[in-house]
């Protein structure tokens, strides 16, 4: 057996993986064979047996076999190929919305067909839309899968079949190389070796319930989850210990700048804002770096808190960097801060991908020589060409969009002669207390738990897709009769950006036909940042009535005149994302409304989630409910909630493991530092460098 370790086996060692495929795999965090094996299936399909048609159930997947009784093309808005199969127990209809003449001609009456797909309730009988199918010769033996079929999350240009072939080869490699078994028995409560767990989870025998696997409840999954949580906890503990030993500039107000700034505002800070600012000022007065997380619900006024933190550093002659996750949000911050700070002679600069040529060179020079005191940008702020004059405070907005590694890179950039900048992280994704201790174990936490006066409550209604016509009329009424603006959000989850962009464009066209008098704009993830910003600027300037968007508008867009939001397929989104999207309205003095449209029938979990949205606008309550609902079984990936980047763990689902993980992490840090390093390296890869920051 080879002594080579899995993370040393390149992807190109697998047949069929060249540079182009390796680049696509890299997009989803897969850089070597170990990464590929840690990319576990998000769900499984049981294709190991044929289900009699009489026994199929809506909203479940099934393999069926039957004979064609009828195949016809129905003509409407677009042609649909409908094929009726019978197996003697009952009938089922296969529907194809995209088909060609060859497909149609293969479904001759009497032909034997095997099909697999999700069963839906139809008008006359059960239906499967776009099934995978095979037309069989009458004497051809039926072949079925021997294990559950894994379904992996993927990216544009990577098909499920290709990923399965690659993992098949990776499993063969797994059998031939040594796998470092990092968890000694006393730290492995689940009694599976790493190799056993990986072999089982990529190709589970049909005796294991797909439902148990999808809930993350199988001991083989728990074995991997436990090790990953342990690695993250060890990394956070190392980080916190390291940070406390570093030096920072202690900051105290030198002038009356704060009082003059507050006097210039048309409103007074809320009690919660004042309390959080006091926490920050206390941290900034210390000679070790502040590492504070400020959680504020949507619209709670985090920007003002950030401005007051920045003022203290600037009053000491220092620079402040504020990093936002998108160019739209960075530009919005740049405008807000310029309006607030320039009257006091404070120069505000901004740096994003679209700042190019001479303007970029001039901005970089102004940052380097200290002419600009407040620098705002996207991740462009930590490119090597950016050199700060005297950076004392780093503010990161919407922490969940940045990995820990990124914010530490920015902190390293500010380090001079072993003096490190203070860090303030702001998030509008409220984190249940149970989880905050794990995700942000290296940070102190403050909460802004009060909304500024003048914010109007948002009325939320839940309506079926069947009432789409009424919803379109409501949009017309809001935009034309009430002179308001509206958002129409389209969602496609686990689909490619290309499909999402096409769907959004099609919806925008449909709405433009239905509402010819309205000025309609479109933004989606496939557009260049400049295009997105141009459309957003038009919307903000009220030159557009309706903005059709994908979930790219989730964070920080501020248009007070927008008072109506429609979210299509709302049942597909998690609570955190729904809450963020809804927070784009309710920012002015007019009563705002949010319409959550869903495709019936609505599952039990989706129904609970939409009810929580209808009943509450409190982000912390919604986060706790999210925890409860997910604990009942429907698991959405961690990435969607923006909690942290995990390969196999989901903090919501796996929170019961956390106390034991924390206990073991404390023991390992003290008793076995080399084991801590090995675990961190395996699960965090090059991101592990941040533990030495």
Regions found by a protein language model. Name each.
Residues 589, 601-693:
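C-terminal accessory region of SF2 helicases/translocases
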Residues 74-265, 638:
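Upstream accessory/linker segments immediately N-terminal to the RecA-like ATPase cores of bacterial MutS
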Residues 275-278, 289-611, 667, 671-675:
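Inter-lobe coupling/hinge segments of SF2-like helicase ATPases
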């Amino acid at each position: 057996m080879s002594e080579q370790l899995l993370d040393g086996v390149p992807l190109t060692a697998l047949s069929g993986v060249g540079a182009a495929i390796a680049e696509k795999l890299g997009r989803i965090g897969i850089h070597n064979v170990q990464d590929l094996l840690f990319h576990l299936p998000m769900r499984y399909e049981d294709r190991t047996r044929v289900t009699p048609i009489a026994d199929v159930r809506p909203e479940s997947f099934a393999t069926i076999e039957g004979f064609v009784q009828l195949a016809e093309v129905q003509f409407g808005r677009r042609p649909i190929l409908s094929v009726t199969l019978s197996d003697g127990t009952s009938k089922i209809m296969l529907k194809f919305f995209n088909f060609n003449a060859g497909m149609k001609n293969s479904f001759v009456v009497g032909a034997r067909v095997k099909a697999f797909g999700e069963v839906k309730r139809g008008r006359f009988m059960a239906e499967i839309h776009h099934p995978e199918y095979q037309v069989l010769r009458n004497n051809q033996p039926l072949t079925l899968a021997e294990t559950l079929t894994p379904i992996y999350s993927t990216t544009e240009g990577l098909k499920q079949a290709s990923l399965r072939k690659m993992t098949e080869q990776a499993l063969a490699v797994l059998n031939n190389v040594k796998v470092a078994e990092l968890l000694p028995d006393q730290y492995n409560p689940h009694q599976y070796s790493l190799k056993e767990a990986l072999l089982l989870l990529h190709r589970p025998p049909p005796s294991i319930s797909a439902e148990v696997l999808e809930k993350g409840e199988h001991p083989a999954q728990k074995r991997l989850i436990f090790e990953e949580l342990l690695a993250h906890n060890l990394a956070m503990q190392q980080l916190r210990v390291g940070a406390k030993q570093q030096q920072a500039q202690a900051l105290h107000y030198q002038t009356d700048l704060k009082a003059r700034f507050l006097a210039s505002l048309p409103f007074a800070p809320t009690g919660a804002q004042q309390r959080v600012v006091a926490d920050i000022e206390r941290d900034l007065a210390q000679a070790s770096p502040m590492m504070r997380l400020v959680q504020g619900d949507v619209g709670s006024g985090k920007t003002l808190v950030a401005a007051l933190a920045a003022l203290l550093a600037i009053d000491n002659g220092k620079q402040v960097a504020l990093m936002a996750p998108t160019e739209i949000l960075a530009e919005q911050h740049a405008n807000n801060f310029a309006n607030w700070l320039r009257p006091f002679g404070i120069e505000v600069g901004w740096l994003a991908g679209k700042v190019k040529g001479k303007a970029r060179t001039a901005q970089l020079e102004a940052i380097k020589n200290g002419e600009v005191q407040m620098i705002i940008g996207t991740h462009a702020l930590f490119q090597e060409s950016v050199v700060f004059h005297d950076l004392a405070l780093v503010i990161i907005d919407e922490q969940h969009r940045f990995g820990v590694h990124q914010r530490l890179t920015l902190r390293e950039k500010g380090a001079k002669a072993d003096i490190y900048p203070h860090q303030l992280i702001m998030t509008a994704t409220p984190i249940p207390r149970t989880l905050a201790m794990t995700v942000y174990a290296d940070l102190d936490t403050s909460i802004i738990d009060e909304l500024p006066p003048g914010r109007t409550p948002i009325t939320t209604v839940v309506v079926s897709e069947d009432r789409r016509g009424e919803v379109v009329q409501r949009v017309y009424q809001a935009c034309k009769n009430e002179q308001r603006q509206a958002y129409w959000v389209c969602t496609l989850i686990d689909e490619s950006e290309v499909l999402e962009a096409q769907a959004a464009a099609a919806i925008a066209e449909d709405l433009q036909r239905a509402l010819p008098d309205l000025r309609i704009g479109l933004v989606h993830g496939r557009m260049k940042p400049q295009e997105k910003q141009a459309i957003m600027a038009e919307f903000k300037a009220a030159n557009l009535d309706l903005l059709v968007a994908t979930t790219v508008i989730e964070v920080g867009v501020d248009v007070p005149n927008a008072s109506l939001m429609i979210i299509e397929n709302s049942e597909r989104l998690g609570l955190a994302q729904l809450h963020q999207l809804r927070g784009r309205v309710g920012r002015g003095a007019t009563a705002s409304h949010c319409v959550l449209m869903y495709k019936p029938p609505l599952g039990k979990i989706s129904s609970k989630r939409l009810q929580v949205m209808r009943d509450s606008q409190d982000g912390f309550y919604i986060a706790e409910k999210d925890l409860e609902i997910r604990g009942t079984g429907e698991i959405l990936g961690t990435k969607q909630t923006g909690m942290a980047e995990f390969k196999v763990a989901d903090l919501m689902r796996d929170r019961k493991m956390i106390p034991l993980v924390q206990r073991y992490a404390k023991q390992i840090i003290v008793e076995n530092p080399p084991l801590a390093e090995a675990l961190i390296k395996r699960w965090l890869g090059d991101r592990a460098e941040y533990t030495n920051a």
